[in-house]
């Protein structure tokens, strides 16, 4: 087994490689030679060299591309929801690319998150629209209706199983006035924690279903939970998450046994991936109705 990191300096890719005994492939000037009998873990890259593409790839790059782009991701989930037959939907917030609709939401009393950067992380490129909003909506490729949340989680999923679960918790070294409860990231006073984990079952279920919906083999799913609605909402999936401690151990355990299951990838899951890859290239394929049973996606 090999690992292709999105950048050579990825500490998590290095740690995972050491844990499972996998060699890392250089992102440039590599002498790696691919073949169908080799397995490569794609660690967050939306493009892979020709030699790597000759191998069995865990998290194909076209699907990683969809996951890394917030608008593509929401559209992919929306299309999955529109064509699933068993009513098992991935819950996502309302979204639009239409600034007029975003303005309407604000004037109707909602808070809207304008996303200026589709591939940003840690709150990068976010602008909140709320209250007495008299100006025109800022020009942005994506607007998402804000959902109030009781908790925010990161659920690590690998091969259809939750390998670790973290909660975003307040840092106590940050003053009250510097805490931003709406955008919970490190700069706004939050860290990942495992204490006081009382996680609704729907959180894990939504994380697993979101990965299945776009054909990801693994990913760290960011989810918020609205207690009043008793609903978990999927926000995004990270395909190159930070790995330390218990999180790293969970991934190592799953990847050590991975080659036993990739031989039996369901035909319909492969078809779903082709659909997602078409979306990544900007071509809209005609999706086939699917239903989800366990890890398998079957016609």
Regions found by a protein language model. Name each.
Residues 203-212:
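A short, acidic, amphipathic alpha-helical segment used as a generic capping/interface helix at domain edges
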Residues 157-159, 223-227:
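Short, low-complexity Ser/Thr-rich regulatory SLiMs
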Residues 117-202:
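Phosphate-binding site of ATP-dependent enzymes
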Residues 212-216, 225-299:
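C-terminal active-site "lid" helix and adjoining low-complexity regulatory extension at the edge
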Residues 112, 161-164, 219, 233-236:
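Protein kinase-like catalytic core scaffold
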Residues 45-47, 117-119, 240:
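Short glycine-rich anion-binding loops that position phosphate/pyrophosphate groups of nucleotides
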Residues 111-113, 141-143, 218-221:
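A short linear hydrophobic-aromatic micro-motif
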Residues 2-108:
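Conserved N-proximal alpha/beta basic substrate-recognition cap immediately N-terminal to
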């Amino acid at each position: 087994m090999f690992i292709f990191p999105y950048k050579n300096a990825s500490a998590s890719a290095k740690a995972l490689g050491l844990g499972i005994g996998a060699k890392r492939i250089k992102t440039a000037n590599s002498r790696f030679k691919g073949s169908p009998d080799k397995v490569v873990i794609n660690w967050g890259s939306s493009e892979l060299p020709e030699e790597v593409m000759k191998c069995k790839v865990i998290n194909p790059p076209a699907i990683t591309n969809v996951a890394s782009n917030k608008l593509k991701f929401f559209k992919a989930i929306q299309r999955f929801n529109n064509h699933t037959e068993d009513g098992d939907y991935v819950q996502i917030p309302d979204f639009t690319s239409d600034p007029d609709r975003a303005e309407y939401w604000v004037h109707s009393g909602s808070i809207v998150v304008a996303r200026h950067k589709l591939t940003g992380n840690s709150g990068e490129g976010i602008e909140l629209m709320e209250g007495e909003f008299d100006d025109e909506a800022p020009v942005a490729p994506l607007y998402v209706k804000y959902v109030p949340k009781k908790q925010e989680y990161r659920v690590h999923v690998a091969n259809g199983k939750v390998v670790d679960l973290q909660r975003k918790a307040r840092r106590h070294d940050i003053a009250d006035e510097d805490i931003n409860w709406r955008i919970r990231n490190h700069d706004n006073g939050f860290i990942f924690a495992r204490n006081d984990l009382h996680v609704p079952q729907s959180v894990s279920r939504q994380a697993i279903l979101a990965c299945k919906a776009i054909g990801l083999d693994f990913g760290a799913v960011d989810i918020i939970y609205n207690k009043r609605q008793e609903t978990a909402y999927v926000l995004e999936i990270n395909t190159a998450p930070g790995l330390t401690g218990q999180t790293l151990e969970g991934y190592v355990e799953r990847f050590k046994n991975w080659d036993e299951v990739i031989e039996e990838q369901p035909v319909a899951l492969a078809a779903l991936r082709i659909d997602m890859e078409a979306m990544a290239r900007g071509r809209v394929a005609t999706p086939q109705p699917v239903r989800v049973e366990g890890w398998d996606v079957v016609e």
